[in-house]
């Protein structure tokens, strides 16, 4: 079955990102298994729903790929892919997992797993770029991902220091100082989330054959919606500590 150039481009693009996000979906499952449930039932249900949607989307695209894309289904497939990619940003879950667990009982194999997943993402993206000789995808976008990953590691380290400092010095701080520490931790978390969104969507900048204005608009919309999802994840993971700190401030 012959595919037009535009359809073939969508097939290659969709397959590449579905492969990468499948690995991230598996990393989410690992993170969920290694973290106890929170008391927020709605949040627990939502995170599993997002993971399930991610996995089903990957399966859907895999079936489409193995069965050969049909021209009438490519639009639907790409629309569903875009819709779910807005709601499934696995690195955000792992980043917030780090922020909460690194200060107390972080397990070493989780760190190793994340490093492995990040490496696979970069290798997968770089390998397909060269093997398939896609003209409008530059290999240097992989370097962008690793630079963002390094910055993410630095911001995570800052968040861990703030988190541990807040725990150790909580009893000796005044109400104002305690609130300032908590605000610093919160804004550091926001910065980490925003940076992770950039890391995930930076490679998309070279994938569009449309006008520059359309590409910028699309990226801005996706990154904004994804950042809101990040904030939802941050809210759930840090809710227990936020309530505890606020209760102490009130007392």
List the model feature ranges, each with a label.
Residues 2-5, 36-39, 55-81, 102, ...:
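Helix-loop junctions on the outward
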Residues 16-35, 45-68, 84-90, 115-127, ...:
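Hydrophobic alpha-helical transmembrane segments of multi-pass membrane proteins
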Residues 96-129, 139-151, 175-195:
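The cytoplasmic-loop to transmembrane-helix boundary for the fourth helix
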Residues 27-33, 91-99, 152-175, 228-232:
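Alpha-helical transmembrane segments in multipass membrane proteins, preferentially the mid-helix core
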Residues 73-77, 139-157, 219-222:
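Alpha-helical transmembrane segments
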Residues 1-26, 145-152:
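Hydrophobic transmembrane alpha-helical segments in integral membrane proteins
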Residues 34-48, 74, 98-111, 137-138, ...:
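Membrane-interface helix-boundary motifs at transmembrane edges
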Residues 230-251:
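Membrane-proximal linker segments that couple transmembrane helices to downstream signaling/catalytic modules
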């Amino acid at each position: 079955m012959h595919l037009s150039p535009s359809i073939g481009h969508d097939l290659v693009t969709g397959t590449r990102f579905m492969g990468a996000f499948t690995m991230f979906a598996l990393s989410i499952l690992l993170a969920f298994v290694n973290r106890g449930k929170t008391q927020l039932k709605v949040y627990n249900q939502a995170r599993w729903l997002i993971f399930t949607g991610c996995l089903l989307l990957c399966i859907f695209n895999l079936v489409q790929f193995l069965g050969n894309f049909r021209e009438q289904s490519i639009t639907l497939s790409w629309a569903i892919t875009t819709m779910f990619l807005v709601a499934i940003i696995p690195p955000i879950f792992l980043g917030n997992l780090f922020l909460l667990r690194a200060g107390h009982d972080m397990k070493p194999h989780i760190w190793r797993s994340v490093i492995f997943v990040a490496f696979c993402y970069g290798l997968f993206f770089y390998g397909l770029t060269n093997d398939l000789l896609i003209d409008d995808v530059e290999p240097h976008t992989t370097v962008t991902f690793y630079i963002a990953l390094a910055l993410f590691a630095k911001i995570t380290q800052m968040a861990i220091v703030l988190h541990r400092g807040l725990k150790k010095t909580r009893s000796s701080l005044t109400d104002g100082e305690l609130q300032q520490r908590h605000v610093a931790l919160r804004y550091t978390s926001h910065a980490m989330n925003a940076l992770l969104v950039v890391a995930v969507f930076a490679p998309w900048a070279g994938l569009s054959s449309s006008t520059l204005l359309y590409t910028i608009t699309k990226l801005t919309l996706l990154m904004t919606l994804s950042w809101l999802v990040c904030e939802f994840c941050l809210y759930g993971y840090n809710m227990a500590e936020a309530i505890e700190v606020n209760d102490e401030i009130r007392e």
